[in-house]
Each structure stands twice: as C-alpha cells, then as structure tokens.
Amino acid sequence: MELSVIIPIYNVRNTLRRCLQSILCQQVSGMEVLLIDDGSTDGSGSLADEMAMGCPMMSVCHKANGGLSDARNAGLRLAKGRYVTFVDSDDEVAPGTFAALMSLLHRNEDTDILEYSVRVHAGHSSEHELVLPDKRWPSARVYWEESEAWEHTYACNKVYRRTLFARVQFPSGRVFEDMWTIPQLLSQDVRVQTTSLGLYIYYWNKDSITVSADGVAMTQLLEAQMRAARLMHMSMLSRRGWKLYRSMLYRQLDVYRLTGRILLRWPFVKLICRLHKSCR
C-alpha cells in the first residue's frame, strides 16, 4: 500500500459526496481511503457506507464522537500506506493531484513531508491561492522560517511518511490542532519538500473554529504558537521570526481581552495589555 487518505467525517452530509468524488477520481494505484465517522448524527455515516459499497479502496470506521484530532488518530491506527495524507470532508482535491505527488515522492524517496499548493477559503470573498515553490529544503528549520510555514500549517495539504506518526499524535481536546502537530513533526529532523504540483481546495466554513474562536480557542492557539516557536528554535530578532512573534503578541491581546490571562512572559507584554485595555 502506497498512500492512505484519511478523511474524518462529522455531520457533513451536504458536502461529503462532493469531497469523496474528488478523491475517487484521483486514479492512484495502491491507494486506500479511510472514512472515519466521528459519531455523526445527520446521516453522514450512512452516506459514507453507501459510497464505500462496491469500492474496494474505500472503508468506513464508525466511532463515538471524539473530535477531529481523535478521528485523525483513529485513521492513523488503521492506515497501511507508506505515506498518509488528510482531507477534511468539506474540502476537495483537484484532479490528478495525488498521482503527481506520488510520482514526485517516488523520484525523491528521502522526502518525509511533501507540501503542495492550496486554494484557501474557496467560495468566499477572501479566496486566494498559496502556490508553493518547487524546492527541497536543506532543513526543516530553514523551511519553517523562509517559507513562513506558520502561515500555512494546514495538516491537509501535505503528504507524510507514515512512520513520522509513530511518536506523534494529534492533540485530542484541543483546537488549532494543526499548529500544535506540524512543528512537532518538523522537529524530528525530517526532509521537507514543497511543490507547485497539485492543488488542495480548502473551503470557507462560517462555523469553523478559525471564524468563531472564543477565549479558550484563542488561548489554545497562542499556546500552540509558543510551542512552535520553541520547537523550531525561532529567533525573535530575525526578520521572519519577528512575524511569528508579532502574531503571538496579537493573540496575547485577544486572550487578555477575552480571559484576562497573560501567557507571554516578555517584560513589556503586561504593560501592552494594560494599555490596550485602557484604550478600548
């Protein structure tokens, strides 16, 4: 088995068929599609069973609701492919994408993580495309800083060597799980490659956590950013490094406004938070 495609499913009956049709047209040999029904209550699980019927490459796992991370981890436990990738059940993958990516991986067998281009917020006024360079990065840290990877820590527009997840799991009970997990994978001294080939189509969702984040979610995002900066040995003094720290400062202001908590222990942060509060 070459590629395991893991698709968590939770109450997405309106988009699931569109998503799965984009996967089934990929025409990749040695591919399995793992549908992880995370306790859906809208008939999504039944639709998954229906679409998997008569399709040998596709299988369905029904489980109690545990959240996105738990569903992805369940898929990883079932996966048999040399490589794994994730697709959210309201998104699509452009035709020919997986064939192009697997061909590239076969020509570069030392690549551990292959990231490909993504159309962000498809169907929304903020829609744009992130077209990645065709490049093999000298180190994960160089990739992280020079590509400003914290701006595109999507789990879904990447193909991973499955063995990377032997000691890494997605964090159950947390939101912004991609920002938590991707730096941990990168910290394993991996070989990263980016490509302009293929396209992941990430649809805008008005109910997503990135749109409706509350104080708890903002706190978890800031914690994930702080952890990423530590794992990737980011320097606040570098030009690109400062961009991440600036984002962390903005998140700290959000967290302080919503919860009153100060997580960043920089000497000037408490003063900035108080000034921000007094200027509201």
Describe the predicted segments one by one.
Residues 1-219:
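Nucleotide-sugar donor-binding/catalytic module of glycosyltransferases
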Residues 154, 203-280:
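C-terminal subregions of glycosyltransferases and related glycan-biosynthesis enzymes
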